[in-house]
């Protein structure tokens, strides 16, 4: 209990935690029962709190009690949860251990963030732009959470940028920003960050996206990303040659929105659910060939 009080006095835990933490009942049997590897993970993985001098400040059973009381809040329920944890019937996710009773309590492990086709809400009020997502991502990563993004709304490489009379660099270039963001944050020194990036198969930059982690590039950029391709029924039917035609149309999401007032990602199968404006069609590709490339890319980068 004295250790908990010292952590509160140091500002590492919330003052209101004192009542719940003061009811701590040590479980030395639990502390001693953990294997060497488990204790190594507990300490080196920063599941235990550390003081201002970065020294370990709690035992495994102390950490379990801290988590149990932060989650349950009501004492009897906390005792039951504590019993389950110390019996290893329940093992809470990492953010519980990192953040329970701290000033930035955040228990969720996974988040998804929208990335709209604009740089900042400063110039585009009411929209959730690239650098807005980047800022929120940094906060989530700092607290130990992982983040997923769909980059399908970003205009393709080479498309016009009317505000600057320039051309767009495409989704993959912006993904490098998010990748570097994780390296800088390092999840608050707790663990390596985790990110998922996705792109719809109809996006004109789909080949560049799926090859960003394959071949000679697989050990270079986007080391903090897993990537995945969203496919729809139309694409799979083309890939399987259902109607004898394997050609699949690519869509510029910016032009699609300009012409329809809707986001292409709102549709499960945009080709079947709406009439794609001809101006939004940015070429076509062989679905059967691309499906093979996607499968090979998954193997090559895995």
Task: Describe each region flagged by the PLM.
Residues 1-301:
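Extended catalytic cores of very large enzyme megasubunits
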